[in-house]
């Protein structure tokens, strides 16, 4: 048994949360940071290795594809800006949605309150969104309840990292 401690000295950092996804294949390993500056939050995704740079760059392409695909639907796509570190490696700066709840939280709340009508309304809207212009386009197979943030009537897709060019079946 041993204890471990990390002591950091120096100026305060803007990072309030950091998650390392280094249990993935090297070309998919990333670090996700949430930063806070002047009361405003931002999300950044960095390649954990140079091999993961293409994975980060693909996020910008995915944002464009899904913004076009969901145009006219009731789903917006979270904004992303691809930037570069001084070493030339890319990172994605993504809008942090303040005062939002995930679709998962809303569905869970309906279940806890025995609100079947509310659950059905949310789930039906989700199904319509998932099927929107699905034929022949890139699919996000992680368009799951926790990856949709809800602010009032605005639904926003917050994660478009895991995609495929194969059609996702509507009936399972």
What are these regions (language model features)?
Residues 1, 45, 82-84, 124, ...:
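Short, intrinsically disordered, charge-balanced linker/junction segments flanking boundaries
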Residues 2-14:
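Core SAM-dependent methyltransferase catalytic element
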Residues 13, 37-39, 151-154:
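Short acidic-glycine loop/turn motifs at beta-strand connectors
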Residues 19-69:
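ATP-binding glycine-rich loop module of kinase domains
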Residues 41-42, 90-92, 154-155:
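Hydrophobic residues embedded in beta-strands of well-ordered beta-sheets
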Residues 76-123:
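Conserved structural core of kinase catalytic domains
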Residues 115-139:
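An alpha-helical support segment within catalytic cores of ATP-dependent transferases
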Residues 136-172:
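Catalytic activation segment of kinase domains across protein kinase-like and atypical kinase folds
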């Amino acid at each position: 048994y041993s204890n471990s401690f990390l002591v950091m000295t120096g100026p305060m950092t803007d990072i309030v949360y950091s998650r390392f996804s280094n249990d993935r294949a090297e070309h998919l390993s990333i670090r996700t940071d949430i930063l806070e500056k002047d009361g405003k939050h931002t999300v950044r995704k960095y390649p954990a290795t140079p091999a993961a740079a293409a994975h980060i760059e693909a996020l910008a392409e995915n944002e464009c594809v899904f913004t076009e695909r969901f145009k006219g639907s009731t789903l917006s796509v979270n904004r992303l800006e691809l930037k570069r570190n001084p070493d030339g490696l890319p990172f994605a700066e993504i809008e942090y949605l303040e005062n939002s709840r995930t679709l998962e939280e809303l569905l869970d709340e309906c279940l806890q309150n025995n609100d079947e009508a509310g659950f059905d309304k949310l789930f039906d809207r989700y199904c319509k969104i998932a099927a929107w212009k699905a034929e022949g386009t890139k699919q996000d197979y992680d368009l799951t309840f926790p990856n949709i943030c809800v602010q009032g009537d605005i639904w926003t897709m917050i994660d478009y990292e895991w995609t495929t060019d194969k059609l996702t079946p509507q009936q399972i």
